[in-house]
């Protein structure tokens, strides 16, 4: 067949032949983020539901989880997840993903509340119970809302379940004028650990941490970056 075709009738192609899906791998990053968020939330909901059923004899959330998985899988159809659907379709997709996250939040919160009600929280200060839905031990920052600080006093320290003081830090709160508390929690896999926020009376114990950012005229520097800024234009020069 090719031998019978005139040579000048064959076009010269100098670009990608697979042009119909151009850009769809980056289009609608929101739907890709929501898809992954729902996947992780559903896996965690399965764990919490199992824990609640086995340990607390709570109603099984299997049917709700199954329906939520069907919603996620439907939205993994290639036109939707790839980003090639029309914008109106993604309004429905956002609502669908929202219903999935609502389902997983309800299951998680129900089980956590049931477990928390059975934890001994007597003692000084206010208990801070940190849960870990992953099957391995993690060390992760925990943010304590300013409402606990208002209840206990201005200065707080954090101790673990053995009474050992945990380094903590005041940070800017999510509400205007408030300061939250930040500390690192070490929590076993598929478990919880109880910390306590205790008021610091008298002279508050305060230690200056390592200076993370060095600032001088036209220079910002930390362990990884040294950025010089033009004092007139504000542009980064190096």
Regions found by a protein language model. Give the residues of each.
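Glycine-centered coil/turn sites that cap beta-strands in beta-rich domains
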Residues: 140-148
